[in-house]
Amino acid sequence: MLKVEMLSTGDEVLHGQIVDTNAAWLADFFFHQGLPLSRRNTVGDNLDDLVTILRERSQHADVLIVNGGLGPTSDDLSALAAATAKGEGLVLHEAWLKEMERYFHERGRVMAPSNRKQAELPASAEFINNPVGTACGFAVQLNRCLMFFTPGVPSEFKVMVEHEILPRLRERFSLPQPPVCLRLTTFGRSESDLAQSLDTLQLPPGVTMGYRSSMPIIELKLTGPASEQQAMEKLWLDVKRVAGQSVIFEGTEGLPAQISRELQNRQFSLTLSEQFTGGLLALQLSRAGAPLLACEVVPSQEETLAQTAHWITERRANHFAGLALAVSGFENEHLNFALATPDGTFALRVRFSTTRYSLAIRQEVCAMMALNMLRRWLNGQDIASEHGWIEVVESMTLSV
């Protein structure tokens, strides 16, 4: 199996001053291309350290993706490190120098002398185009390893990997079929509770069951070779049965996007009134393109479930909205939710202890609860579902 590794560079990455989103993206992208990473390393802006790890990994990896260090400043050392590791010098790539000059000219800017450095590549390097920036990439062969050097800017990095590097890998190596990965996301049940039921399932050869907990959701993943797809799809029915009502969506699209699409398909507009969630619902749904009307965030106040239900019913009528959704303030571990629809208004009062969680997490939980109510109504289900750690203490319905 092809051994693919990644090397992230830069003091800011090494010291945790920025999150290495490029590494996470590459690992996921390559995994779904049948190229799972076998190792990831991070090195700071130190020439000796860079040269050392390039030489070291060249003895073990078949492919190494090096990210960062291609800029015009003194701490951008990747090209020099590659040349030093190979025992050769840097040469000026005249065509890229002209391309950079054109890039700046089209934007009404003068290229700084320091940018010339970005056109200096190891003598044996293969040039890799960057159509969206000034940091070209390059590839070198060092011992057994084919190394690709890429820019640190995420938008440039992704374009280069997808359109330049992956085609080269497919041309040079015989790549396996991408693995099959079935995913669903649950809300309201603990990871241990799900695992207790799912761990008894008999998995096909080479297939693994994975869990990813990110409060307030848990993602279940069944991953395996393409040759086992039929068996995995059969097993997936058992996984969904065990997860039961806690399943809120399948795949990776996300609940706000799925709700947005359903609202649009059914030509429902939605108005929101938020207290405890502080506009989080509006943010999530607007980013997904949901058909929102007037949305409000009001200070938290104590109110009965009946008050919340009557208020959101009036709001739906006043704004001529198809649907209206309300989240009350959070008082003494209690919270109200209400959804006004053409069929009537449905309201829940819930209790859950959240002292161990931050305010941001508590707001995420409440936003997910509200979205799940909306999802269930759109799917023709009762708005309340069983949640192991959220107790429904009161419910009511207002007729149309």
Swiss-Prot record:
InterPro entries the record matches: CinA (IPR050101), CinA-like_C (IPR036653), Competence-induced_CinA (IPR008135), MoaB/Mog-like_dom_sf (IPR036425), MoaB/Mog_dom (IPR001453)
Q: Show the Pfam families listed in the entry.
A: MoCF_biosynth
Function, in words = Does not have nicotinamide-nucleotide (NMN) amidohydrolase activity.
Q: Which PANTHER family does the UniProt entry name for this protein?
A: NICOTINAMIDE-NUCLEOTIDE AMIDOHYDROLASE PNCC, NMN AMIDOHYDROLASE-LIKE PROTEIN YFAY
Q: Which NCBIfam families match?
A: cinA_nterm, molyb_syn, PRK03673.1
Q: Family, per the entry?
A: Belongs to the CinA family.
Name of the protein described by the UniProt record: NMN amidohydrolase-like protein YfaY
Q: Which organism is it from?
A: Escherichia coli (strain K12)
